[in-house]
Amino acid sequence: MANDQEMSGWTDLLHSSTKLLEQAAPSSQFPPLQRNLDQLEALSRKLKAKTLRNEAPSQSIAATRLLAREGINADQLSRDLKSFELKTTFEDVFPAETTSVEEYLQQVHEMAMVSAIQEAQKDNVRSFNNYMLKVLEEDCIKEKRDFLHSLSKTSMLPKTKMINSSRGSHAGSLVPLSPQVSSKPGTELVSMTNKPIHEKKAYVYAEVVKKLNSARERGLPFKLATLFNGAYESLEIDLTRGKSVNMQKLWQLIQGMTGEESAVQHGVSKRMALVIGARRHLECGHGKHIMDTIQSHPTQAALGGSVGNLQRIRAFLRIRLRDYGSLDFDSVDARRQPPVDTTWQQIYFCLRTGYYEEAREIAQSSRSSQQQFAPLLTEWITTGGTVAAQTAATASEECEKLLRMGDRFGQTTYDKKKLLLYTIISGSRRQIDRIMRDFSTLFNTIEDFLWFKLSCVRDVAGGSSSMIVNDGLVPYSLDDLQAYLNKFEPSYYTKNGKDPLVYPYVLLLSIQLLPAIMHMSNEAGDEGYNIDAVHVAISLVDHSILSEGSGTGRKLSVMDANAEASSMIRQYGSMYLHHGDLQMTLEYYAQAAIAVGGGQQAWSGRSNVDQQRQRNLMLKQLLTEILSQEDGIHFLLGARGSGEEGELGRFLPDIKLRQQFLIEAAHQFQEAGLYDKSIELQKRVGAFSSALETINKCLSEAICSLVRGRPDGESRTEGLVLSGNDILNSYKYHPDVSAQERHLVMEQETILRELEAILSIHKLARLNKHLDAIREVAKLPFLHLDPRQPDTTSDEFQKASSYFQTCVPDLLKVALTCLDNVADTDGSIRGMRSKIAGFLASNTQRNWPRDLYEKIARSF
């Protein structure tokens, strides 16, 4: 019905429109326009918009009027509202969509937890970024310091002044001392208070090295590691903050390994003796730990007036086992409460502390150990750990029983210390590996771990093959220990560099001596560990043990290991040479030579032939290096003689060997062009003819240089002539000169005078004394240029020395120049020209300068 009415309305509207269109007459003023319905609608909307723009609603006008009355700018308010931002409310974030308070609170809780987690993540990221930035800055600073240190390695030693270096005097120490400072050690250390650590170390170590060389020269005993340790202690360096190992601990270890603190056990190999020494060092350290623990807990220790070793162990156990109840050695009435059996604890800690006799007494007195374990322990103590194969097998079987008991009834059914003790006596690699796998928490410190391993080590090279074949046991060797320790990077031991000496300490304990030294030498820093490394090498080489500890994978020979140490010591000594301290250079160079010679044995000549040869070769090479320095000859040889008054006599006491060395050094200097030093050495050993020959060679070259215009040629020639005359003077008063030497000296003196005559001719020519120069030329032998004398054959000129012959071409040029400047009154000038021409014609094979032949041709 409604649709019919709507359609009728549209129909009426269309009819009315048609009538209007028919009534409208066309106008000439306005052209007819055709529009469809869509166009009409668009035009109508546009027209309506124009009318609405100019018509403000009454509400808008009223609002503007109200704002104006209150003093508010409507336009400014509109602009502000455009930039206004609505903030979300709590209800917006947590819409109340839940139907109960509990659900709503649960939703709020979850959202709060999510927000907290997100904030924590942001804090973690920010903290991580800050930490990484700090680490990068520290690494950058460290790399910069290491780079600067590598650029100025020689600055590790301060500059020194040369001091009178006569034998027995103190020449140029690392720290220059003023004349007012006393030479007592106490006052010297006072003057070094403000010096850097590396300078202090270098000074006190150098004093020990000087004393070492002096003692070894005289064949006196010398505890080198002990004195190095004492020198380090005297510095009172406090570098132990946050560090478990310092240099003093390393020196104490070396004392123990070298046997300076206790007698070395006989009947074992040198390598096994080092193992025992390292183990004794750990035992001594544990003894100090026990005393510190007792002093920290005096009430619980209840030591009283007892000072025996066993009483100390029991006092320590009272503290350690205080939570276990009454201990057997303190129990009064065992029937009331069964005490804790500490037999195995006492034995273990007695051995751990080095109280072997007390450990044996406990084992023999206890019912749980006296029958089976006591004999095994006695043999282990007596043999130094090298028990018989049957003993090792028995101990290994007991280990198997204990392990099976633990698997069946639980590991708490027996004392773990009992298992460790039987494993130590067995020395079985299989048992040790199982303990490392199943009971890795038994060892509280790395010292405890290494002591256990060192106690298990057997001297495999000393006859372990029979043990393996007969009983099927594979003994634990030092190589096994080294291979296990080397699985971990150095940073694992040093805590990423925070405790830098732990790694070399572990290497030394595992008898990896050379790797320990090399690692320390590469430690650049203010602590001066590279200086310590050099002196550790000196100590180990002196005891002839460095080659025993090349480390796993570095099977070096004795010479290779000692050569590594020698190179390090030599490089360190060259730093003193760089600063002009010849005295300390000599001391360290002597140690470098001794290193390749086998250490202490090289001083007494007890090392093998090859080592002695290597030692002599290096010593001569290093002494030659010192001789080449300024004042080196005076330092080694003294004011006169061939070394009796200088330092050379200390290391080459035999006069024949000393003279032979100096002659060889002079020959090397001559080949290197160091003629002054070569002449001085030849003069010192009485080789006057050789010295004169060197002077004649240099004088011949100097004359040629003088003719060619060298500015210092004249002073050079005068100095050589004076040196030659000085040698001839010394020769006259020398007591022991052979007939052959006298003949050779006379020959060289003749050559010197001939060269001196040639030199005088050049001087006369420069002074324009041409006639005098010509007369001197006519007097020269071998040339026979005097026109009044008969001609000679060319063979006579061959008899002249090579030094004389070298000067002849320049001499003939000067002679021709002089002839051109002198009037020929009697034909003698022309006669001399003819003589010169004939002389040149007979020596055309010598390839003399072309301008000489041209000059003689022009003169005719």
Swiss-Prot record:
UniProt cross-references to InterPro entries, sorted A to Z: Nucleoporin_int_Nup93/Nic96
GO BP term, example: protein transport
Native source organism of the sequence: Arabidopsis thaliana (Mouse-ear cress)
GO-annotated molecular function: structural constituent of nuclear pore
Annotated family: Belongs to the nucleoporin interacting component (NIC) family.
Keywords: mRNA transport, Nuclear pore complex, Nucleus, Protein transport, Translocation, Transport
Pfam family, one: Nic96
Full protein name: Nuclear pore complex protein NUP93B
Disulfide bond sites: none
One of the record's GO cellular component terms: nuclear pore
Complexes and interactors: Part of the nuclear pore complex (NPC). The NPC has an eight-fold symmetrical structure comprising a central transport channel and two rings, the cytoplasmic and nuclear rings, to which eight filaments are attached. The cytoplasmic filaments have loose ends, while the nuclear filaments are joined in a distal ring, forming a nuclear basket. NPCs are highly dynamic in configuration and composition, and can be devided in 3 subcomplexes, the NUP62 subcomplex, the NUP107-160 subcomplex and the NUP93 subcomplex, containing approximately 30 different nucleoporin proteins.
Location(s) in or outside the cell: Nucleus envelope; Nucleus, Nuclear pore complex
